[in-house]
Design a protein with these regions (language model features):
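Linker/hinge segments immediately adjacent to helix-turn-helix/homeobox DNA-binding domains
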Residues: 1-15, 31, 70
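Short helix-to-turn junction characteristic of helix-turn-helix DNA-binding domains
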Residues: 24-28, 67
Length: 70
C-alpha cells in the first residue's frame, strides 16, 4: 500500500487521515485503531468519513480496494 506521504499528496489527506487509511488497508479494525492511537471510536469514524469523501469511496471496503491498487 502507498506511504502516508503519498496518500497525503494523492488525495489531500491530513497525516492523521492518511495514517488511518494505511492502517485500515493493513487490515486493522476501527476499534483496534482507536485503542492503539488512544482515540475514541467516534473520532476514528469521523476521520474515516473524511477519508472516504476525499478518496471518492463510499465504504471502508472500497477504500481498502482502492489502496490495494495504488
Amino acid at each position: 500500500s502507498p506511504s502516508i506521504a503519498a496518500m497525503t499528496k494523492l488525495f489531500d489527506l491530513t497525516p492523521a487521515e492518511a495514517r488511518l487509511a494505511t492502517l485500515l488497508a493493513a487490515g486493522q479494525s476501527v476499534e483496534d485503531i482507536a485503542a492503539n492511537l488512544e482515540l475514541s471510536r467516534e473520532t476514528i469514524r469521523n476521520r474515516l468519513k473524511a477519508v472516504l469523501a476525499k478518496t471518492g469511496t463510499h465504504r471502508q471496503a472500497e477504500l481498502v480496494a482502492l489502496m490495494s491498487r495504488l
